[in-house]
Amino acid sequence: ALMKTKLFINNTMASSGIGLETDAIKAAQAVYCQGQICMSEEQEALCPFDRLEGEVAIVVGAGPSERRRLLLKVADVMESKTPKFIEVMAMEVGASALWAGFNVHASANVFREAASLATQIQGTPLGFAVPTEAFEMATPDGTGALNYGVRRPKGVIGVISPWNLPLLLMTWKVGPALACGNTVVVKPSRINGLFKDAIDKGAKVVCGGMAQGAVGVLNYLNRVNAVQPGGTVISLCGPASAGFDIANDSVYGLSSGDDMIKQLTPLGFAAKPEDNVEPYLLGASRKQGKGITTTVISIDGGMALGAG
């Protein structure tokens, strides 16, 4: 049977508004398989970002305990779909059943670990919003002062996952981001179009207990230009050159800098040089064959951590 993947935006499976589709292929055999990928363009890509930017409360509003319950449910659903994941990973990645099964099991455990953190992030197992760090400090008047910090969600997290480990290298970004109360927009590799169908089902489980748009899943983008300043973080796996390519193919242009930390100068958002935000590519290696690294682009200049 012909499998057709769609976009997952605002809790709804939708076809591309511009009607673009591309054939899926079996990477292992380099032949076409029975499926078509619904491609997304700029208007669809911007939709989840526009809706979520600055509205983190829609995820936080679910509450830490509810986020924990949802993430545990996602893990169970994921493992129940193991045979389907194995089948699709064999077609698209050429993975053996043993390797694909391991990835599903490990990915489910990532969500379980993330679930265990959901009620701890704000400093209490009961999930109340209390200061997470506090210390007393002497003051000249002798009364003393209490300093404390409160953890808050970053905002919208854009996740770009690679073709070779499409599940594991996606879940260990998505799980912690949701546990911390962020909203997430996922863009799998264009090669993993059929694999995305299984991802969508997990997204629907998460969104079932959250406000509309907590998770969005897009397909292939002709241009990675859905990035916007103001709290957006893009997390991807690969060498620094991958981040540079994405930056060059988006609304951001590269300026000079060393190989390990590159400044990205946004175009079209800043009228004056002093208004430019300064996102960075962090912890990336430009040398190939050095294992998996993570490139994290923080659009508001803050330092965001990711795994890859």
From Swiss-Prot:
It is found in: Periplasm. GO terms for cellular component: periplasmic space. The keyword Mitochondrion does not apply. Its main location: periplasm. Completely inhibited by HgCl(2), CoCl(2) and CaCl(2). The keyword Membrane does not apply. Optimum temperature is 35 degrees Celsius. Pfam families: Aldedh. InterPro entries: Ald_DH/histidinol_DH, Ald_DH_N, Aldehyde_DH_dom. Its EC number is 1.2.1.-. It is an enzyme of class 1 (oxidoreductase). GO terms for molecular function: oxidoreductase activity. Optimum pH is 8.5. Keywords: NAD, Oxidoreductase, Periplasm. Transmembrane segments: none annotated. Belongs to the aldehyde dehydrogenase family. Catalyzes the NAD(+)-dependent conversion of limonin. This is Limonin dehydrogenase.
